[in-house]
Amino acid sequence: MIIGASEGLSSSSAKSEVKFKYFHNTSASLIHKSISEMAKFVKHYGGKSDTVYGLAGLGDLYVSAIGGRNSQMGKYLGEGFLYKEAKKKFMDEVTVEGAELAIEVGKKLKQDLNEKDFPLMLSIIECICENKKLEISW
């Protein structure tokens, strides 16, 4: 459950690189940062860190990032759409698990997590929960 929560939020960021000029390098950096934050997230909540590097973590992040609903939403957020606008325009009838999770637990995570350690995850949460443009503070 812990790794699923972390992966859902992380995969939303993996496709958000489209707003950056050098998107391949940025995409690689986002994936690296996602994995790093997933490991910290799992440790913070008492999960097993090695899960991050297995199929439930890295494997699921890869699958989600190359074509899942979370990464599709991340692409729209990276293109500059607000969450509510992108949801209504492109994914109105689609469940985006990472976004649903952010809405459900975002407030608690913002209280629990340090922005220095989780800039990517907290940027995604803020973007979705507060319907703001995606700005990654890393």
Where are these regions (language model features)?
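Mobile gating loops/cap/lid regions near enzyme active sites that modulate substrate access
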Residues: 1-2, 11
